[in-house]
From Swiss-Prot:
Residues 1-18 form the signal peptide. Its main location: secreted. The gene is ECE1. Induction: Expression is not markedly induced by human epithelial cells. It is found in: Secreted. This is Extent of cell elongation protein 1. One of its GO terms (cellular component) is host cell plasma membrane. The N-terminal alpha-helix of peptide ECE1-III allows insertion of the toxin into host epithelial cells membranes. It comes from Candida dubliniensis (strain CD36 / ATCC MYA-646 / CBS 7987 / NCPF 3949 / NRRL Y-17841) (Yeast). GO terms for biological process: symbiont-mediated cytolysis of host cell. Transmembrane segments: none annotated. The lineage of its organism: Eukaryota, Fungi, Dikarya, Ascomycota, Saccharomycotina. Secreted protein cleaved by KEX2 in 8 similar peptides (ECE1-I to ECE1-VIII). Stimulates biofilm formation. Disulfide bonds: none annotated.
């Protein structure tokens, strides 16, 4: 699997996780302990098929839950990136993912703003259509992959270096802009009295992703390498700061926690 596709999946999970924490700190989301060699399960298509359509009438938390039910756990995604990528140095991958983690407050604001904007259109039914599209996430995977591939090809043409790494580094803005683009597409489809709004969204999704990504990647500063960055350590630290040590402990193994404690003592 190409780095850019895995990177986008990771960015999607990071953003969704951040928004969940922001909207409902007490939200009891099941977390599996990440072992030394985690296995990433295939998304369960039946989950999306069985989601009650009444989710469209619930809060933003419901939308994000539908997303999280269809993507791997955040720890497994990051581990998969590290194991599956060829041609990218480990320290580069650590650095860029840690950069996204460090920008978590901005990710929360970006996703929160985009989804709140969508929710504000609920009175004309737009929010229901956006929600139903997200619930049917498995159908959206192929257009997303196409959009990512278009983005990569355009970035190559424009001479962007470290394309995959830059996609992740700029993920907060990209996620926000893509959600905004989908919202506008739904609104336009309703104005045009389109019979199948989801089909309209799927048709335009590759272009939406490519359009919002091209200018961002073309104008983004060169990727900065930091060989001293350790992804897992930063992730655990940020988790403790955000959701507390007990919840953070549920997301990682005891060995990882022990390593982090040892690191703190070494730095003291």
């Amino acid at each position: 699997m190409k780095f850019s596709k895995i990177a986008c999946a990771a960015a999607f999970v990071l953003s969704s996780q951040a928004a969940i924490i922001h909207h409902a700190p007490e939200f009891n989301m099941k977390r599996d302990i990440a072992t030394a060699d985690p296995v990433v399960a295939e998304p369960d298509v039946s989950v999306a098929a069985n989601v009650d359509t009444s989710i469209a009438k619930r809060s933003i938390i419901g939308i994000l839950t539908a997303i999280l039910n269809n993507v791997p756990q955040i720890i497994n995604v990051i581990t998969t990136i590290i194991k599956s990528i060829t041609g990218n140095k480990r320290e580069d991958i650590d650095s860029v993912v840690s950069g996204v983690i460090a920008d978590m407050p901005f990710v929360v604001r970006a996703v929160d703003t985009a989804l709140t904007s969508v929710a504000s259109t609920k009175r004309d039914g737009t929010n229901d259509d956006v929600t139903n599209a997200i619930v049917r996430l498995p159908e959206i995977v192929a257009p997303v992959a196409t959009g990512v591939q278009q983005t990569v090809e355009n970035a190559k043409r424009d001479g962007v270096e470290d394309i995959g790494l830059n996609i992740v580094a700029n993920s907060p803005r990209l996620v926000s802009d893509v959600i905004g683009g989908v919202s506008e597409t739904v609104k336009q489809a309703k104005r045009d009295n389109a019979e199948d709004i989801l089909t309209k969204v799927l048709q335009e999704l590759p272009d939406i992703i490519s359009k919002v990504s091209n200018s961002t990647l073309k104008n983004s500063p060169p990727f900065k390498r930091d060989a001293n960055t350790v992804t897992l350590s930063k992730l655990i630290k940020k988790s403790i700061e955000t959701i507390g040590v007990e919840n953070a402990a549920k997301m990682v193994s005891k060995r990882d926690i022990s390593s982090l404690i040892a690191e703190y003592f070494e730095e003291a």
